[in-house]
């Protein structure tokens, strides 16, 4: 009898469990945040969380192509366009950090005292090796917008090199080339931790109001994609934006430094 009850219970649990497919960015993956959230979510929901980490552009395309139930991304303009086209629903801001410019420590003195615009002009005028993601990610979109504000993206210049890689891999390329790169702070802290607190690339510009980096979750629209698990995607969005989970994200640190910020402004994007 006990065996029958155990088998029935196992079958019931199996039937209720689901696999939630998420498309997300390399920055949420590289920082280790998702690895930390995964066991918490799986324990509370009984589901399995699986994700593919790509640039935001590719993540949104996965949603458009019905290959993900939920998206965790960070390019507000692209996200809103995605929503406008009817590919996503329930877009909810979660957290933010900021973008920073980092450079080989031998170049740091060149940037001293310069604001964001002056730092970009320095890179351009002195032809400092600059590594661009070049992958339509949230970081790539932000970087391109900064160059456009300065007159145009210098794609044809030899000093401007596109990696086509994720954030952490692109940082390592910038390190190898003793160059400059725009990154989100969370991934930089992860890189810094990997280098045991002694990174070759250091922060040379930060703090400009335009460099806020907002992350949101979006459910793939079930009216557009009949195959997606909207029920569990919706529950995940409520879970990740609950006070309990947001407090966990706010307390998530490396080198005793928070990687993401939670506050009221985040929730109003």
From Swiss-Prot:
Classification via Gene3D superfamilies: Periplasmic binding protein-like II
InterPro entries tied to this protein: ABC-Tungstate_binding (IPR052738), PBP_domain (IPR024370), TupA (IPR053775)
GO CC annotation terms, alphabetical: periplasmic space
One Gene Ontology term of the molecular function aspect: ABC-type tungstate transporter activity
Misc: Binds tungstate 50'000-fold more tightly than molybdate.
Quaternary structure (record): The complex is composed of two ATP-binding proteins (TupC), two transmembrane proteins (TupB) and a solute-binding protein (TupA).
Protein name: Tungstate-binding protein TupA
